[in-house]
Amino acid sequence: MDLLIKGATIITLDGENEVLKGDILIENGKISEISQSIELSKEKMFATKVINAENLIALPGFINAHTHCGQTILRSYADDLPLYEWLFEKIFPAEEKLTKEIVYYSSLLGIAEMLKCGTTMFFDMYFHEDMTAKAALETGIKAVLSRGLQTDERQQQRLDETKELIYNYSSDKIKVFFGPHSVYTCSYELLEKVAELSEEFNTGIMIHLSESEDEVNQCYEKYDMSPVKLCQKAGLFTRPCIAAHCVYVDDEDIEILAENGVTAVYNPTSNLKLGNGFAPVFNLIKSGVNVAIGTDSAASNNNLNILEEIHIAALLEKGMYRLPEILKAQEVLKMATVNAAMAADIHNTGRLKKGFSADIVLIKANDLNMLPCYNTISNIVYSSNPSNVYATIVDGEILYMDGRLLTIDEEALIKEIKSIEKILEESIE
C-alpha cells in the first residue's frame, strides 16, 4: 500500500529549504512527491494509507554506520575493561559459544532495538553473517554486511563465506563488503588479498582502524608505519572503505584518509567506555574526510541507540576543542544520514527527495522534551530520545509505529533471548 504523510514538519537534508511544512507521497516504496499540500483522487485514496503528521517531524531514517548486531546477546557481559583485555580475554572466547541460531536471535534483538530508535539501515561486521542477513530480510531493515576476517587457520573459510554472502544476499536491501577486522588481527598478506577481492567483486571494505594507542604502537613496532599507512600500502583505500573509530590518527593519516575518500565512523560511546579516547572529528571534517556515526556493538556501548550517539557526538567535540560553534546540529545529523549513505556508495537514501527510497523516521514533536521548538534540527540532535520515535519506515513499509514492532514478534523474541541467556550463563565465564 502507498503512503501519504500529511502536514509534517519535514527535514529533507537536501540543500536549500531543508525544513518545510508539508506532505510526502510514497508510491512503490519511493518518494514520489514532497510539497505543501498533496491531494489524491478518490480512486487513489482507497489504495493509500494516510498518516496525520501535524504533530510529527519527518526526516531521513538514521543509518548506524558501525555495529556488530550478532553481538547484541553479549550486552553487559564484559564491562569496564580496556579494549585488548575486553576483546581477547572475554569477547573472542565467549563468541566461540555463539551458534548460528544464537546469532540469528541476537541479530533480531539488535534490529528490534534499532528500529525503535528510527534506524533504517545499519553497517555490520560479524560471523554467521548469513543469519544477520536473514534477520534483516525478515524484518525489512536495510544493511551493509561483512563477514569479519582474521588471519588464522579459518582464514580461507571466512573469505569463502564472504563470497557466499555476496552471491546469496546482494540486493536492493543488502550490500556485502569485505571485512578485515583490523591490522592487529589480519596479516599484511590478508589485507592485500582483501583489496584484490573487493576489486574483483566490485564491492567495498570495512575495517576497525586506529582505535587504540596499543594498536598504533604495535603497528609501528611490526611495520614501522601507522595503521592508516599500512592499509594504504596494502591497497585497501583503492576501494570504497569504511574505517571505524580513527581515534589515533595524525595529520598525515588524516590527509591520506581525505585524499583516498575513506569514511571515518565516529563511535563516541564505545570509545569512551573502552577508555580509548576521543576521535579528532573536527580535524577529520576540516580536512575533507567523510565522517559517519555508529553505535558499535551492544557489548561495548551498551546500546544501539543512534539518537544518543548523535547527541554525544555533537557535544564531545565542542568540549574537546572548547569551541561550542563547531560540529553544528545539522552537520551531526548529516553524519547519521547523508554521510553514511555516501560511505557505502548508496545514492538513493539519506535524504528526503523525489525518487529516493522512502526510508523515513517520524518523530513526535509535541512530547514534553521536544517543546518548545525554535529550531527543529536542534531539537532532534540535542533533545530527542527513542521514546519520541513514532514510526520507522523503510522502502515505504512501516516497520515500527506507535510503540509496536510490525515485523517482529516482540514477546516471542524476549522469550528466546532469555532462554539463550540461561544457556550462555552456564557456558561462558
Swiss-Prot record:
Keywords, alphabetical: Hydrolase, Metal-binding, Zinc
Zinc found in the keyword field: yes
EC number(s) reported in the record: 3.5.4.28, 3.5.4.31
Cofactor annotation: Zn(2+)
MF (Gene Ontology): 5'-methylthioadenosine deaminase activity; metal ion binding; S-adenosylhomocysteine deaminase activity
Residues binding Zn(2+), per UniProt: 66, 68, 208, 296
Disulfide-bonded cysteines: none
Binding positions for substrate per the UniProt entry: 95, 147, 158, 181, 211, 296
InterPro entries hit by this protein: Amidohydro-rel, Deaminase_MtaD/DadD, Metal-dep_hydrolase_composite, Metal_Hydrolase, MTA/SAH_deaminase
Transmembrane segment boundaries: none
CDD domains linked to this entry: ATZ_TRZ_like (cd01298)
Cofactor note: Binds 1 zinc ion per subunit.
Catalytic activity: S-adenosyl-L-homocysteine + H2O + H(+) = S-inosyl-L-homocysteine + NH4(+); S-methyl-5'-thioadenosine + H2O + H(+) = S-methyl-5'-thioinosine + NH4(+)
Purpose: Catalyzes the deamination of 5-methylthioadenosine and S-adenosyl-L-homocysteine into 5-methylthioinosine and S-inosyl-L-homocysteine, respectively. Is also able to deaminate adenosine.
Family, similarity comment: Belongs to the metallo-dependent hydrolases superfamily. MTA/SAH deaminase family.
HAMAP family noted in UniProt: MTA_SAH_deamin
Protein name (Swiss-Prot/TrEMBL): 5-methylthioadenosine/S-adenosylhomocysteine deaminase
Lineage of origin: Bacteria, Bacillati, Bacillota, Bacillota incertae sedis, Caldicellulosiruptorales
Gene it is expressed from: mtaD
